[in-house]
């Protein structure tokens, strides 16, 4: 499982120019599931995201978690995160998990985050989406589980 965590001031996702998910301060999560991922990886990723301290405290140190700043989450499924570009010029996506299991695990991931007390907005699994955001920092982390 690979999750790109982007610290944002705001973010939204639209489908056919209609906004389907929108947050203020928080995390934009781009989520890629790979073959072999199970609920164990989903829970581990959700736990890490809930606890990671990448917001600045009053002294300017990255010492605060998403919960500490009352942040929100926008979760977007993105299988292209698992692209293999080592050979040739055309990315291979053989490592990316296929639906319906990938959809179920992405939904499980979002539920895990909600169960931890976060407000979670989402894109639509498998849809062609337009994601817009205002990075805060920028501060971007790639989480591989």
UniProtKB/Swiss-Prot annotation:
InterPro entries: Daa-tRNA_deacyls_DTD, DTD-like_sf. Pfam families: Tyr_Deacylase. The keyword Ubl conjugation does not apply. SUPFAM superfamilies: DTD-like (SSF69500). Keywords: Cytoplasm, Hydrolase, RNA-binding, tRNA-binding. One of its GO terms (molecular function) is Gly-tRNA(Ala) deacylase activity. It is found in: Cytoplasm. Its EC number is 3.1.1.96. It comes from the Bacteria. One of its GO terms (biological process) is D-amino acid catabolic process. Gene3D superfamilies: D-tyrosyl-tRNA(Tyr) deacylase. The keyword tRNA-binding applies. It catalyses: glycyl-tRNA(Ala) + H2O = tRNA(Ala) + glycine + H(+); a D-aminoacyl-tRNA + H2O = a tRNA + a D-alpha-amino acid + H(+). An aminoacyl-tRNA editing enzyme that deacylates mischarged D-aminoacyl-tRNAs. Also deacylates mischarged glycyl-tRNA(Ala), protecting cells against glycine mischarging by AlaRS. Acts via tRNA-based rather than protein-based catalysis; rejects L-amino acids rather than detecting D-amino acids in the active site. By recycling D-aminoacyl-tRNA to D-amino acids and free tRNA molecules, this enzyme counteracts the toxicity associated with the formation of D-aminoacyl-tRNA entities in vivo and helps enforce protein L-homochirality. PANTHER family: D-AMINOACYL-TRNA DEACYLASE 1, D-TYROSYL-TRNA TYR DEACYLASE. Homodimer. A Gly-cisPro motif from one monomer fits into the active site of the other monomer to allow specific chiral rejection of L-amino acids. Belongs to the DTD family. This is D-aminoacyl-tRNA deacylase.
């Amino acid at each position: 499982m690979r999750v790109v965590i982007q610290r944002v001031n705001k973010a939204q996702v639209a489908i056919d120019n209609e906004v389907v998910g929108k947050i203020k301060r928080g995390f934009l999560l781009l989520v890629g599931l790979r073959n072999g991922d199970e609920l164990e990886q989903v829970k581990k990723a959700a736990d890490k995201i809930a606890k990671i301290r990448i917001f600045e405290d009053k002294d300017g140190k990255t010492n605060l978690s998403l919960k500490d700043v009352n942040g929100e989450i926008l979760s977007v499924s993105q299988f292209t995160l698992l692209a293999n570009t080592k050979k040739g010029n055309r990315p291979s996506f053989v490592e990316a998990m296929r639906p319906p299991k990938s959809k179920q695990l992405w939904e499980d991931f979002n539920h895990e985050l909600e169960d931890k007390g976060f407000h979670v907005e989402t894109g639509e699994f498998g849809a062609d989406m337009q994601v817009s955001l205002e990075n805060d920092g920028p501060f971007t982390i790639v989480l591989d589980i």
